[in-house]
Curated annotation (Swiss-Prot):
Gene: atpB
Keywords associated with the record: ATP synthesis, Cell inner membrane, Cell membrane, CF(0), Hydrogen ion transport, Ion transport, Membrane, Transmembrane, Transmembrane helix, Transport
Subunit structure: F-type ATPases have 2 components, CF(1) - the catalytic core - and CF(0) - the membrane proton channel. CF(1) has five subunits: alpha(3), beta(3), gamma(1), delta(1), epsilon(1). CF(0) has four main subunits: a, b, b' and c.
Cysteine disulfide partners in this protein: none
Organism: Chlorobium chlorochromatii (strain CaD3)
Function: Key component of the proton channel; it plays a direct role in the translocation of protons across the membrane.
Principal subcellular localisation of the protein: membrane
Places the protein is found: Cell inner membrane
Cellular component, GO, one term: proton-transporting ATP synthase complex
Protein name: ATP synthase subunit a
Alphabetical list of HAMAP family matching this protein: ATP_synth_a_bact
Transmembrane segments: 12-32, 111-131, 172-192, 195-215, 240-260, 273-293, 307-327
Family membership noted in the UniProt record: Belongs to the ATPase A chain family.
GO terms assigned for molecular function: proton-transporting ATP synthase activity, rotational mechanism
SUPFAM superfamilies named among the record's database cross-references: F1F0 ATP synthase subunit A (SSF81336)
Length: 345
């Protein structure tokens, strides 16, 4: 049956075989701490000793406050940025190996480990769901995780892939499903204690967008051939305008993957910065009232909002990928309809 074939782990493993090279990509992270300001220079002794002492005390208080804000900012950046250390506060931390080959940093970093974990989780989930379909009756509704996965798979298959690509959507479905669940688990893992949001790393989002870009161009070449693909770069204009249209159309090929990259990266990074900033407000102001009235309630609200954003961003990336594939492979009859749909989104 069609439903049973969707849950074959082999289909997802094949796509992961293409996606997994990004897991070995090293990310260079600047871990340098800001240098502390030098000690206040020696000042002349004046007759008014009381005024000098007051000025010195005020300066020291201002310096301590600035140092506290700077330290809070360092902690926030430490949780957002990639690193060669996985912290398990208060139990300690694990140093990850640094690997440099021919001058290229391919070190195993925190986000690389998270990508490995996400890959294992996605494969395990669908392997478990496939096991239920093999052992259960075809007439019996799936239960538990298999039921939830089937609902999401049907949604991506019908409302995303089929709706945006149309005829022949089946051959792109394994990629779209893999991208959706991969991004979703990446986003959710960043909300778990000791986890990290790999999709908050622009290297990861750029790699995912690059896969969509190449798949889109392959779909265009298959649908229109070399001649039709190159003719699209001229935009159907007079040859005198080709010198203008070709560069514009060529640049336009790369605006879509860049938009995918920035959209996912910015949204997943911004939410975590807001949560951590709200938490640290109470520490900076040293006020329990601020913590109870503002920091904690707003942090919980933003955290719940992040759960929604995790699903939303996975859906948007997958939907736009399907839309770009549909635009690239659409023939002249359906081109205007796809263009109108793209403009609407």
């Amino acid at each position: 049956m069609e439903r049973s074939s969707i849950f074959q782990p082999k289909r997802f493993v094949k796509v992961f075989a293409v996606l997994l090279p990004l897991l070995f990509n090293g990310y260079s992270v600047s871990g340098a701490n800001p240098t502390e300001a030098p000690v206040a220079q020696h000042t002349e002794v004046t007759a008014n000793a009381a005024e000098s002492a007051h000025v010195a005390e005020a300066g020291a208080a201002h310096g301590a406050e600035g140092h506290g804000e700077e330290k809070a900012g360092d902690v926030i950046m430490h949780h957002i940025l990639d690193s060669n250390v996985i912290a398990f506060d208060p139990f300690g931390e694990v140093d990850l190996p640094k690997i440099v080959v021919a001058g290229f940093d391919i070190s195993i970093t925190k986000h690389v480990v998270m990508l490995w974990v996400v890959s294992a989780i996605v494969i395990a989930l669908f392997a478990a769901a496939n096991g239920q379909y093999k052992t259960g009756s075809a007439m019996r509704a799936p239960k538990g995780i298999a039921n939830a996965l089937e609902a999401l798979v049907d949604f991506i298959r019908l409302d995303v892939a089929k709706a945006n690509i149309g005829k022949g959507y089946e051959k792109y479905l394994p990629y779209l499903l893999t991208v959706f669940f991969f991004i979703l688990v990446c986003n959710l893992l960043g909300l778990v204690p000791y986890g990290a949001t790999a999709t908050g790393n622009i290297n990861v989002t750029l790699t995912l967008a690059t896969f969509t870009f190449f798949l889109t161009q392959a779909a265009a070449l298959k649908a229109h051939g070399i001649k039709g693909y190159l003719a699209h770069l001229t935009g159907g204009t007079h040859p005198a305008l080709w010198i203008i249209m070709i560069p514009i159309e060529f640049i336009g090929l790369f605006t879509k993957p860049v938009a995918l990259t920035i959209r996912l990266f910015a949204n997943m990074t911004a939410g975590h910065i807001v949560i951590l900033s709200l938490i640290f407000i109470s520490f900076i102001l040293k006020s329990y009232i601020v913590a109870v009235v503002m920091s904690v309630p707003f942090s919980i609200f933003i955290y719940l909002l992040e759960l929604f954003v995790a699903f939303l961003q996975a859906f948007i990336f997958t939907m736009l990928s399907a839309l770009f594939i549909g635009l690239a492979s659409a023939h002249e009859g359906g081109h205007d309809e796809h263009e109108a749909s793209a403009a609407h989104h």
